[in-house]
A protein has these predicted regions:
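Short beta-strand elements bearing conserved aromatic residues within extracellular beta-rich modules
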Residues: 69-73
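Short beta-strand segments within Ig-like beta-sandwich modules, predominantly Fibronectin type-III
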Residues: 84-91
Length: 342
C-alpha cells in the first residue's frame, strides 16, 4: 500500500480532514473540505472556431461539504510552459472561441470555501483550416500505481524490474531496486540500492493529448480531446467522429493490496469496448498506442467479451503454445486476423 500514489492521497486527505475538523471544532468555525478533482472532462467542437469544455464534479462519499462552488479554467497556449487563468464559472461547462490554428491546452480546478482541488488532467484542441471534422483524442492513460510485488515462501518484495509502476507526475522517493527479499533476514529485509537517490523518476503527467495533437496538426488536421471517463459515461458521442486516437500509455489492470477494492486501470473496460465496437462497426478509424494494448486483455481476469473485442475489433488473438493452451501474451507473440504472427 505505502508506495501506491492513490493510497498516499487517501491517507493524506484523511489526515487533512482530521486536522480541519479538529480546528473547526476548537475555533467554532464552519467546516468545509476542499473538493476532489473533477471527472469526465471533455472538449467538444460546437461549430467552427467555437468549443465547449465540460466536466462533472466528483462527490466525496465521506464528506458532504466537499462539493465545489465554482471552477477555475486554466489555459496554456502553444509554446508556453505554464498555465494561466482565463475564467471562472459555477456551471459544469465553459464556452470559448479560438481564432487561430495553434494548439491550446486546458485544465479545470474545482474550488469551494475549503480550498482548491487537485487540477484535472490536461486536454487540448486545435482548429484546423477549413471546416473538417476534428480527430478525437481520448486519454485512456489514467494509471498511477506502486511497483509490482510478490510473495513466494520466505521471499517477498517488489518486482520493480518487471513493472516499475507509475508515479503521480514524478517521484523523488525511489532510491534503488530492492536487493534483499528474504523475510528471515531481520532488519536487512527490504534493503535496496542507493544509485537512484539523486534521480527524479518520471510519472503520469496526465498531459498527453497535446503531444499526440502536435503530430495530428502536422498532418493538417484539427483535433479535440476527452478523458476516457467522458466516453464511458456517454458524455462524448463517438458517432460524431471519423478518426479516434486512443492513448493508453502504461495503462494496465491491477489490484491494490489484498484486492478487495477491485481491479483498477484496465486498458479496455466493458463500456469502452462496447463504445469502440460500435464506432468501428460504423466505419470509424481507430488508432491505439500503449505498452499493454493487447497483453492486458489476455493477462488479467479476462472474459469472453474481452477476447471477442480483441479478435473482432483489434484483429488479434494470442498465439497457441506448442503443448496447447495460450502462450504468455507479454512475449509479443500475437496473431493478426489473417493468421500471421506479428
Amino acid at each position: 500500500y505505502g508506495l501506491d500514489p492513490s493510497f498516499k492521497f487517501t491517507v493524506g486527505r484523511a489526515i487533512y480532514k482530521g486536522i480541519a475538523r479538529f480546528l473547526s471544532e476548537r475555533k467554532d468555525r464552519e467546516l468545509v473540505i476542499q473538493p476532489l478533482p473533477v471527472k469526465d472532462f471533455a472538449i467538444t467542437r460546437e461549430k467552427k472556431n467555437h468549443y465547449r469544455l465540460s466536466w462533472q464534479p466528483t462527490p466525496d462519499p465521506l464528506e458532504e461539504t466537499a462539493m465545489p462552488d465554482k471552477y477555475v479554467i486554466l489555459a496554456r497556449n502553444q509554446g508556453e510552459l505554464g498555465f494561466h487563468k482565463i475564467g471562472e464559472t459555477s456551471k459544469t461547462h465553459y464556452d470559448l472561441k479560438v481564432a487561430d490554428n495553434e494548439i491550446h491546452s486546458f485544465r479545470i480546478v474545482a474550488l469551494n470555501k475549503g480550498g482548491l482541488a487537485f487540477p484535472s488532467e490536461t486536454l487540448s484542441l486545435r482548429e484546423a483550416p477549413g471546416d473538417k471534422t476534428p480527430v478525437l483524442i481520448i486519454n485512456g492513460f489514467t494509471r498511477i500505481s506502486a511497483p509490482a510485488n510478490f510473495k513466494d515462501g520466505n521471499n517477498a518484495g517488489f518486482s520493480a524490474d518487471k513493472d516499475f509502476g507509475v508515479p503521480y507526475i514524478k517521484d523523488i522517493s525511489f532510491t534503488g531496486y530492492q536487493t534483499e527479499f528474504n523475510r528471515n533476514t531481520g532488519n536487512a529485509f527490504g534493503h535496496s540500492g542507493s544509485n537512484f537517490t539523486t534521480q527524479i523518476i518520471a510519472g503520469n503527467t496526465f498531459d498527453y493529448p497535446a503531444v499526440h495533437g502536435e503530430a495530428i496538426a502536422n498532418a493538417g488536421h484539427g483535433f479535440v480531446s476527452s478523458s476516457v471517463g467522458a466516453v464511458e459515461s456517454g458524455a462524448v458521442k463517438l458517432s460524431g467522429y471519423k478518426n479516434i486516437d486512443l492513448i493508453l500509455g502504461k495503462q494496465k489492470a491491477g489490484i491494490v493490496g489484498n484486492g478487495k477494492s477491485g481491479v483498477r486501470f484496465k486498458t479496455f473496460t466493458p463500456e469502452l469496448e462496447r463504445q469502440l465496437s460500435v464506432f468501428t462497426n460504423e466505419g470509424g478509424n481507430l488508432f491505439i498506442s500503449g505498452e499493454n494494448v493487447v497483453s492486458d486483455i489476455f493477462s488479467f481476469r479476462y472474459g469472453p467479451e474481452d477476447r471477442h473485442f480483441a479478435e473482432v475489433v483489434l484483429g488479434v488473438v494470442p498465439a497457441e503454445a506448442p503443448e496447447g493452451g495460450l502462450t504468455e501474451t507479454r512475449s509479443g507473440k500475437l496473431l493478426s486476423s489473417d493468421g500471421k504472427t506479428v
